[in-house]
């Protein structure tokens, strides 16, 4: 039982040896180890075993990913998403997690590819639109200062803003209440692309957000 650590740990070997119940046993062990700081390493090891044995089981993946991220281990987290998407290419959660992680690592082109691959499976996770749109906006912002006196860079900057527009507009449509996320990006997109009508509308929205 989960509320009896000693009993659970006492019979862990027997539980794990029973193959039909192996998945359930691993989850029980993980939750038992998680209850105490003294067994945290065992918790991590159990998650590793669980993911290696059942890579398409999100339980082990999400908890392992959270541990890596809370300890600032982004490369390890990325390696985990590589394994997960490789083992379960149709898993939307894994693809979304990879796209989100790549965006946080400022690996923008890769995050767009990852977000697009998730959207190709399903658009049920609206944040994938936000990730791809944000990545394009960030790349545009990186060129802003130099683009003032460089026509080629300005063209590239505007291209990024243009690419970002449909993603961010779709995100806004799906998540109209999240003005805090799409308000500022769309403001900058419309401003730089000289979208007069759209800019006037978004200016009124952003005024209430900022």
What kind of region is each of these model predictions?
Residues 2, 33-34, 68, 102, ...:
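Residue at a conserved register position within TPR or TPR-like alpha-solenoid repeats
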Residues 3, 37-38, 72, 106, ...:
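Residue-level detector of the short coil/turn that links helix A to helix B
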Residues 13-17, 48-52, 82-87, 113-120, ...:
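Conserved structural position within tetratricopeptide repeats
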Residues 20-21, 54-56, 89-90, 123-124, ...:
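Short coil turns that delineate tetratricopeptide repeat
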Residues 25, 59-60, 94, 127-128, ...:
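TPR alpha-solenoid repeat register
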Residues 29, 63-64, 97-98, 132, ...:
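Structural register within alpha-helical repeat arrays
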Residues 137-167:
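Short coil/linker segments at helix-helix boundaries
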């Amino acid at each position: 039982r989960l509320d009896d650590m000693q009993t659970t740990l006492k019979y862990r070997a027997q539980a794990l040896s029973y193959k039909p119940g192996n998945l359930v046993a691993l989850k029980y062990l993980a939750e038992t180890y998680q209850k105490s700081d003294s067994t945290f390493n065992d918790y991590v090891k159990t998650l590793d075993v669980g993911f290696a044995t059942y890579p398409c089981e999100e339980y082990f993946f999400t908890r392992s990913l959270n541990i890596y991220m809370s300890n600032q281990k982004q490369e390890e987290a990325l390696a985990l998403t590589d394994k997960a998407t490789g083992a379960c290419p149709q898993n939307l959660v894994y693809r979304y997690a990879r796209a989100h992680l790549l965006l946080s690592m400022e690996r923008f082109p890769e995050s767009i590819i990852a977000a697009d691959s998730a959207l190709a499976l399903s658009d049920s996770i609206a944040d994938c639109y936000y990730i791809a749109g944000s990545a394009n906006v960030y790349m545009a912002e990186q060129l802003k200062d130099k683009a003032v006196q460089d026509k080629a860079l300005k063209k590239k900057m505007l291209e990024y803003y243009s690419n970002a527009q449909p993603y961010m507009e779709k995100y806004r449509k799906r998540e109209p209440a999240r003005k805090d996320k799409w308000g500022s990006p769309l403001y900058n997109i419309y401003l730089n692309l000289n979208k007069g009508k759209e800019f006037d509308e978004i200016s009124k929205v952003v005024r209430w957000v900022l």
